[in-house]
Amino acid sequence: MNIMKKSFLGAVLSLGLLSAAHADVYKFDNTHTNAVFNIDHFQTSTNHGGFYAISGELKYQPEKQDAEMRVTIPVSALNTGVDAFDNHIRSSDILDAEKYPEIVFKSTKWHFEDNKPVSIDGLLTMKGVTKPVTLTTTKFGCYMSPIFKAQVCGGDFVTQIDRTQWGGDYLVDMGMTKVVDIKIQAEAVKQ
């Protein structure tokens, strides 16, 4: 009887591993993937910038409402449209790109409604600090790309972070906000 239970358990576990191994793998298309941030500048105007050379991988199984994602953002890819401002944000005052050249997001749980993701919980690592973040989905879909001749899935996501949780306290003591709004546009191509 014990042997039968162990055999059954082994078969069930094998099926679970097999289905996880068959998740469709997608690579992010960096021409359609970016992360843009907005931060209030002393209650006068809003500073904008973004990262445009994002790479990563998505494992997606919509029928099982399951997905995994890992995204890497090189700090060197920062672009505000003003070189001097880019260099200041990359400096040790703010992101310290020399010491921490990458920002990484790794999903921990996807939440679905009607087979579409509505939010993604994950861990954001920035300046050597890892904290939980939730991305809210504002749009998501998949289509057959006429360019890649493959399925592409992607969407728009938003979140808000307190930058001081990652050691980003530059000018907070002088009244600049801690809150950073982040908008992400992402598309990934099935491999």
Q: Where do the language-model regions lie?
A:
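Bacterial N-terminal signal peptides that target proteins for export
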Residues: 1-11
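Hydrophobic membrane-targeting and insertion signals
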Residues: 2, 20-23
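Bacterial N-terminal signal peptides
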Residues: 10-18
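Low-complexity, acidic/polar, glycine-enriched regions of mature
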Residues: 22-191
